[in-house]
């Protein structure tokens, strides 16, 4: 897939998101093989691997998490790539800038790609002739082979672990937990990619998983974003592009590949492990698709081919671009209408707002409204004081994320960077910043 696609230019830094599962393990080993000198269509980018420890969100104890990391430790250095092990608790120390959509570099043309290949080969030839590092791309990675020798032995802060556990325990439904976990994981990987200079992120989503994801997202109200959620490339983040090179392989093909080439993998319990079939929308869609696949073997491929026909287009036309408002969580363009719009969603929003408004007493109508922020207090602290905090967050969310946020009783457990960015956007809209 990567040999045929010219999305990744020679010399680019690519971060491989490895979860320990079969698909992501197969992806890492195929990239390792593609970077070798014996490969027919040799890959020419610089790779790194990241592993996110999600044990706290799944209810694992410190001993269970340490056991998982002990299984991960010998696999990552064996790849020869720079690797990073991060805990999901680190989302509580992320800056609000992780939710900003940075400017995206223009896509290079066919001639630009060929020129980049020639320049890369010439540079490799000069390095080889000068007695520098070898020509094997996998052996000339400038970063060190590990992120931090103590990173595996140092557990995250206890306060952050408790905060993450409290956040996921407060979510009512498993569907909302799965979506929240995916969102926080994406934000953390995106921050690590930007911090270490990676311009691409590869995920191990297989054809089977993408077919399940397509049907799930349709049920979750994310139909407007299917091209980004299931496509080969996802450019919603701007400077970091998410690539899905495993989308042409089914889970069965991945299992055969891992068996034939002895690809190691690590089982890590997920938030829906041992959950019943009807516990969440994703679990229900997974059982539905896999059950159909056993009776009709073309089910997965048919759903997958449907996703290939989806076209990425801004909601307000090509002129909308990066200036259009984006969702605070999934970072897609907002797909909701205003309360006064002539749509079903607009009517529901207007009805909800009218129910929230309470009748104002006669004595209060004669009192002029005071300033939003009290004297001596910064604007950032009092901009949303007179508004419903839940409404301040909801106005910056897409339809699907709004539905999921209804399963979160309180906004207090959310990571600070999400609340800070929501407050900043509200102030910017009201003109206080």
Locations of the language-model features?
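Ankyrin-repeat TPLH-centered helix-turn motif and closely related helix/turn capping elements
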Residues: 62-67, 72, 182, 293-306, ...
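Mid-to-C-terminal catalytic subdomains of enzymes
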Residues: 199, 203-210, 245, 249-308, ...
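AMP-forming adenylation/ATP pyrophosphatase catalytic core
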Residues: 7-14, 18-23, 42-50, 61, ...
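ATP-dependent adenylation/nucleotidyltransferase module used to activate substrates
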Residues: 1-232, 236, 248-251, 260, ...
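Glycine- and other small-residue-rich loops at beta-strand/loop junctions that grip anionic moieties
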Residues: 178, 243-247, 315
């Amino acid at each position: 897939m990567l040999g045929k696609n010219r999305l990744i230019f020679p010399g680019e830094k690519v971060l491989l998101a490895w979860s320990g599962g079969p698909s992501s393990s197969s992806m890492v080993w195929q990239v390792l093989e593609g970077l070798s000198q014996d490969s027919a269509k040799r890959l020419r980018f610089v790779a790194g691997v990241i592993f996110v420890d999600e044990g706290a969100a799944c209810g694992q104890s410190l001993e269970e998490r340490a056991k998982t990391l002990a299984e991960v430790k010998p696999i990552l250095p064996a790849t020869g790539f720079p690797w990073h092990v991060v805990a999901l608790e680190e989302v509580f120390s992320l800056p609000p800038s992780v939710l900003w959509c940075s400017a995206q570099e223009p896509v290079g043309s066919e001639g630009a790609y060929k020129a980049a290949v020639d320049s890369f080969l010439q540079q490799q030839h000069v390095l080889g002739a000068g007695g520098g590092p070898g020509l094997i791309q996998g052996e000339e990675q400038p970063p060190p082979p590990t992120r931090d020798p103590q990173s595996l032995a140092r557990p995250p802060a206890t306060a952050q672990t408790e905060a993450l556990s409290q956040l996921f325990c407060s979510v009512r439904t498993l569907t909302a937990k799965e979506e929240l976990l995916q969102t926080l994981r994406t934000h953390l990987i995106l921050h690590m990619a930007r911090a270490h200079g990676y311009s691409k992120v590869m995920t191990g989503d297989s054809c089977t998983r993408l077919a399940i994801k397509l049907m799930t997202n349709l049920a979750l109200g994310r139909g407007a974003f299917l091209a980004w959620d299931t496509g080969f490339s996802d450019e919603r983040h701007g400077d970091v592009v998410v690539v899905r090179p495993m989308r042409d392989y089914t889970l069965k093909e991945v299992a055969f590949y891992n068996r034939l080439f002895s690809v190691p993998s690590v089982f890590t319990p997920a938030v829906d492990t041992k959950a019943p079939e009807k516990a969440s929308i994703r679990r229900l869609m997974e059982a539905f698709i896999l059950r159909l696949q056993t009776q009709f073997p073309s089910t997965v491929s048919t759903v997958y081919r449907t996703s290939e026909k989806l076209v990425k287009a801004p909601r307000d036309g090509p002129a909308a671009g990066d200036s259009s408002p984006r969702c605070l969580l999934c970072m897609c363009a907002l797909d909701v209408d205003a309360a006064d719009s002539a749509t079903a969603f607009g009517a529901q929003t207007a009805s909800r707002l009218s129910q929230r408004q309470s009748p104002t007493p006669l004595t209060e109508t004669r009192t002029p409204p005071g300033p939003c922020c009290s004297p001596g207090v910064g604007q950032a602290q009092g901009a949303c004081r007179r508004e419903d905090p839940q409404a301040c967050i909801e106005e910056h969310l897409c339809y699907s994320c709004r539905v999921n946020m209804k399963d979160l009783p309180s906004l207090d457990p959310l990571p600070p960077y999400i609340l800070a960015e929501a407050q900043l956007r509200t102030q910017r809209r009201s003109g206080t910043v």
